[in-house]
Amino acid sequence: MPNSERHGGKKDGSGGASGTSQPSSGGGSSNSRERHRLVSKHKRHKSKHSKDVGLVTPEAASLGTIIKPLVEYDDISSDSDTFSDDTAFKSDRRENEERRGTDRSDRLHRHRHHQHRRSRDLLKTKQTEKEKNQEVSKSGSMKDRVSGSSKRSVEGSDDYGKAQLSKSGSKESRSSKMHKEKTRKERELKSGYKDRSKSHRKRETPKSYKTVASPKRRSRSPHRKWSDSSKQDDSPSGASYGQDYDLSPPRSHTSSNYDSYKKSPGSTSRRQSISPPYKEPSAYQSSTRSPSPYSRRQRSVSPYSRRRSSSYERSGSYSGRSPSPYGRRRSSSPFLSKRSLSRSPLPSRKSMKSRSRSPAYSRHSSSHSKKKRSGSRSRHSSISPVRLPLNSSLGAELSRKKKERAAAAAAAKMDGKESKSSPIILPKKEKLEVKESGLESKKLPRSIKSEKSTPDTELVTVAHSNPEVKHCLDTGKVRLDENLQKHPAKDLKAQGTKDVKPVAPKEVIVTSKETETSEKETLPPLPTITSPPPLPATTPPPQTPPLPPLPPLPAIPLQPPLPPPQPPFSQVPVSSTSILPSSPHPRTSTLSSQTNSQPPVQVSMKTQVSITAAIPHLKTSTLPPLPLPPLLPGDDDMDSPKETLPSKPAKKEKEQRTRHLLTDLPLPPELPGGDPSPPDSPEPKAITPPQQPYKKRPKICCPRYGERRQTESDWGKRCVDKFDIIGIIGEGTYGQVYKAKDKDTGELVALKKVRLDNEKEGFPITAIREIKILRQLVHQSVVNMKEIVTDKQDALDFKKDKGAFYLVFEYMDHDLMGLLESGLVHFSEDHIKSFMKQLMEGLDYCHKKNFLHRDIKCSNILLNNSGQIKLADFGLARLYNSEESRPYTNKVITLWYRPPELLLGEERYTPAIDVWSCGCILGELFTKKPIFQANLELAQLELISRLCGSPCPAVWPDVIKLPYFNTMKPKKQYRRRLREEFSFIPSAALDLLDHMLTLDPSKRCTAEQTLQSDFLKDVELSKMAPPDLPHWQDCHELWSKKRRRQRQSGIVIEDPPPSKASRKETTSGTTAEPVKNNSPAPPQPAPVKAEPGPGDAVGLGDITQQLNQSELAVLLNLLQSQTDLSIPQMAQLLNIHSNPEMQQQLEALNQSISALTEASSQQQDSESIAPEESLKEVPSVPVVLPPAEQTTPEASNTPADMQNVLAVLLSQLMKTQEPAGNLEENTNDKNSGPQGPRRTPTMPQEEAAACPPHILPPEKRPPEPPGPPPPPPPPPLVEGDLSSAPQELNPAVTAALLQLLSQPEAEPPGHLPHEHQALRPMEYSTRSHPNRTYGNTDGPETGFSSADTDERSSGPALTESLVQTPVKNRTFSGSVSHLGESNSYQGTGSVQFPGDQDLRFTRVPLALHSVVGQPFLKSEGNSNSVVHAETKLQNYGELGPGTTGANSSGTTLQWGGPAQSYGKPYRGAARVLPRGGRGRGVPY
């Protein structure tokens, strides 16, 4: 209905000139029209639906359609013209009009155009203003179209009026010409002041006009009546205006602008707006004219002008290109439009209109809801030019131009008014048909839908096709403009509603021509055109003369048949082309809404013709343009080349685009292999193997690697069967990571599996990002992705089974976390320099490529056996733009390595976040454990604050701007202690660490600056000796986790060799010792035994890893029964074959045990620890670290203690470093049984300190990989706090240990500390301690870390262990307090065993207090007591008054005692480490 309304309106406009009703409404009430237009805005919405119904007769619909588009385009055109050059436009228009239509204007004016003109003038003035505004907005493209459409509209309206009134057809056409001229003049005069306000009103006015146009309106009376009933504004013109109005300022302008943008943002309509200068050429004239014609047409023929405008706009786009068409249009704006002059105005108008329509359509189409359907449809018809532009517009425009040329020739031949009008009509019709055929091809599918909802669908269809058409029009604007000028103007009128179908325009024209005899001639050409459309170029010109005869016959008859043709038409276009379908349907719907009776035959014929023409046109558009140029010498020549090129390109472009889309679709599937297309990639990969021939995705991915494999096979082409899977080495976010060997080359690779079964959205976005980013990063320190393979050779199977992709990486033997936790490696300062140098080079490269890694942690730093480091796992990486900082999520980077700005909610972060993570890794390389281990963000921030100081504006001015600054404040203000805590590391490294761990990200050093630091600037990687890495064992995170789990469950792998632990042991052990010493004044010997209970548990954990179930059972029995066993017996029970070293240790242990027995059971514990210490080469200084319960070193002098020690030693012996750990564990467990042994003559605080941290670490390690490397971890586990041991043990073992611990609470604390210290060095070196560091080592930290370390999946187990341990620890606490170790000593008691861990636990307790709860805290407290020395200072406050006291004072006291073993300064360092590292591990 919108189209019908438009047509009706336009017919009213031009037909109104011929019909009395039009003048009365148009001339009588231009103001009323404005009102109507205003009303029509509202009615437009109403009319949208009613228009959809299609009440208006075909004629009325056509008129309404034409008028609406004209109004819309006029508004735009007129506004643009007014802004650009009203005067020039007016003068051009006047000249053209005068040239064309002096006679016509006289006749038309006499007939009824005086009134009509006045009303139209008002409307046009308003419209002109509107159009000018719109044109200004649309500037170039809209102007051209506007001018073309307005001229065409004028011609079309005149012609249409003639067609409407056969009697007054010629008179009307003349009068319409004169009227147009007058209206243009009036418009020009009025447009200045009425520009915008009237442009909107004009829309309404054209509605009135449309309503008034009786001939065509009557033909479309049903629709018109409906529209009229809705106030005439809803009537064809009203609806058209209604649409225009509702959309009018926005839609008309926007639609116009949108169309111009859509078709050619700066093409016709903008040209027109720009065209004041451009007007001078015919193109410019048309543009100028388009505004003035708009005004005129808006007023006099404004409805028609608008309607035609749409068709004209189509040609107008082309005419807009060539000045001559515009000039021609201007000169003969009403009827000369048939000729080049008339065409030029019409085309320019048409261009305006088509754009205007296309905007309306596009708007409508963009929002189907915009159902000012009559207007919409009219716009659709109007929009047909839009269709013309690119898709079918080229072909359609070419044919139309040919028709226009033919029409021009016919017009030239038929100088008579009728002849002129008929030729114009014919060319216009033909051109319209061509255009519309193109449009139809575009719109055909749409048209089918639009039949259902003609208004909406048509609008949408037209809108969609229009942009394409516009492009084509832009290309072949001139031609189309000329063709459209003659043919489209009328076609648009007639086809305003039928825009989609070329038949509709012809039909409308036929109606007009039926009114006139010459127009009748047009009818025959229509059939001719039907066949010619395929020959758009040549056929249209010849047809132009015949066309006039055609209209008379089909004019009225066709209207009734129209409905039947419509369906065929829609069908035909659909079958013909996708382009055609969209076009015909809108027309069909328009026609049906108009009165399907008008051009059914024509519609079907035109549909076919337009389909054929549209399709052939696109292809043969160049050919049609060639003939056309002769017809329109000035414009056509220029247009034809342009059109020819554009039309073919348009079609080809469409096809190519479609092909590209298809190819692109396959590409994403291929991308999975190499590209990051998420949705398609999964299938494509599977598909790609079969489709290998055109795997573009491999090409996409290949460029990065350019390996022989890529030439051999594209990404995704190969199947994972080409690899032999060796084993699992990791677990990613979307699958496992496998170690595999390439069957062809024999090289080792890592296969990262990307599963799609759980992906609802196809390929995981993280995998896509990783693929895209890795393809851009080529650096020796960034892991290299070789290719992508699928797990199914057959694409169908892949799709059916939801297969997976595998990212193929070069294989790296280890990752940093696995090595650190394994305890198998000791990194020297040179090694650390080498690692950091490579890491920072890779990071600096990424940052210079503008990528943020956002997930730097030890497990993502890969090493090979040659000491080469590579940065891996770019799944969280994102492109970073410093200039356009955009917010990203702050939930990135593993918690332990997350910088304070992310914890405080910063979303616009910088590469400094990665530098912080690397600083954490630097500290970890020295401490062998994560320096900040918490399981909650608040706890993590607390740990950072303790080491680096509290975030405050003094040191970090912008911190107050962060979202969580007020909600995440630490419990208290801390000063920066980093240099104190890490005083043991080289000064150059300390300086670098200090800069990398700066709170303020703006002051933090960059990756590039780190490379210039004293620590790294002189590092020459080529001269660095590679570290002695374990070639027999690949140390990966997963392996480390499993190892930890095993240790925790009691099956274990003994702690790692002591070699690595020495450093960590020393530091953490020392710290632990001081804590232990603090609790009891003379706790040197006691500490080792004090910890036996927890130590035993830890030892058991280590032993369990080493021992089988039966051996474990024996050990547990021994521990539980605490029966006296000799060391040899223990060895036998444990099936330990002691090597000479172990035997020596055992002997030493026996001696120690004897001494201890003499002294006390505690001494025995110490002895057992002493052997461990001896293993670690840490002489046990008889420092009694009095555990809470067993402050006396006599407690565990019993054989049971000896047995425990032996068991621990034996278990450690079983494994390379296990013996020491096991001894400790056994001693710890046994000691816990005897409770007596508190004093370890030799095992002193070192061991105790070392042991305790280990104990706690296990608890906290749970988050980390469950166990350290099985063989090397024994000492650490043994050394690990007893609490950690239980954690590592299975529930049964844990329960037994708990019982033992509860019985000998006093004993374990003292004993374990020594053992811990001794074991600790081993553990640290083995990374068993580090393991704990992650999960267990830092008792307190790990307690907290457990959540963090949950990543490592030990978290839950450790937490349970911790909970269980806490019970024991609590007992210890009780015993400690019993012993007189105040509550603060409680911490100390626990500190006893957790030399390293205690501190962590102490800290953890703080965190735990808030997070985990008292039990955990207590358990941590006990375990922590060992670690306490390290963590105590920080943790004490949180552990509780007692703990705090123990930590602060106890630590100080113990510092003296432990100093004996470790040396106070070192211990301080160790302590710092625990705090910084393990201590930090303590969550709180």
From Swiss-Prot:
Instruction: Provide the positions where the record notes the PTM Phosphotyrosine.
Output: Y73
Bias (Basic and acidic residues)? 1-13, 87-106, 120-161, 183-196, 225-234, 427-455, 483-501, 513-522, 650-662
Q: Where is the composition biased (Acidic residues)?
A: 72-84
GO terms for biological process? cellular response to estrogen stimulus; mRNA processing; negative regulation of intracellular estrogen receptor signaling pathway; negative regulation of MAPK cascade; negative regulation of stem cell differentiation; positive regulation of transcription by RNA polymerase II; positive regulation of transcription elongation by RNA polymerase II; regulation of MAP kinase activity
Task: Report the PTM annotation.
Answer: Phosphorylation at Thr-889 increases kinase activity.
List the catalytic residues.
D855
The segment annotated Disordered runs over: 1-465, 483-699, 1044-1101, 1156-1199, 1219-1363, 1437-1484
Chemical reaction(s) catalysed: [DNA-directed RNA polymerase] + ATP = phospho-[DNA-directed RNA polymerase] + ADP + H(+); L-seryl-[protein] + ATP = O-phospho-L-seryl-[protein] + ADP + H(+); L-threonyl-[protein] + ATP = O-phospho-L-threonyl-[protein] + ADP + H(+)
Q: Where is the composition biased (Basic residues)?
A: 34-49, 107-119, 215-224, 365-380
Question: What name does the UniProt record give this protein?
Answer: Cyclin-dependent kinase 12
**Record organism:** Mus musculus (Mouse)
Whichever gene encodes this chain, its name is Cdk12
